[in-house]
Amino acid sequence: MVTEISTSDAERKMLSDAGYGDPAITYYLEKKYMGHIENADQVSEKIGSCGDIMRVYLKVGDNNFIDDVRYEITGCAGAISAAMAAVDLVKGKTIDDALEINDGDVFKVLENIPEKKHHCIQLAVKTMHQGLESYKKNNA
């Protein structure tokens, strides 16, 4: 008898075997902050050394609080999970508070990703910071 495994279960097992923590896997599978924002207040893009491309969309509300953030990503599971975790860390914060997040903060949320994917966390944070800094500069 052959047991069927869902695609999600198969991906979860593959990512776990590769060294991704449960939160990182969930972020990757759910991709809840993927996409773009119509009429975004700021759009910024970075290309990682590995060739991954991240574009961040920011919607900023009253008193410089971040109302919404979305990423469009051409990249691996590490890039996607890192970007999704970064959104959870900045959403609802002020621009200045959001600029305080760092690679270590994102890593803690993800719990674990393979060492060879740590650059993905750096890319997610740098892309976010670039967007936040550009917003501040353009709206000073």
Describe these PLM feature segments:
Residues 1-38, 42-43, 61, 93-140:
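C-terminal binding/interaction regions
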Residues 45-49:
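Short Gly/Pro-enriched turn/cap motifs at secondary-structure boundaries
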Residues 50, 73-81, 120:
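Short, thiol/selenol-centered motifs that function as redox-active sites or metal-ligating centers
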Residues 52-64:
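Short beta-strand elements
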Residues 55-57, 69, 82:
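Short, glycine/acidic-enriched capping/hinge loops at junctions between secondary-structure elements
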Residues 64-74, 111:
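Immediate flanking context of iron-sulfur cluster ligation sites
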Residues 78, 82-93:
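Alpha-helical support elements that line or immediately flank enzyme active sites
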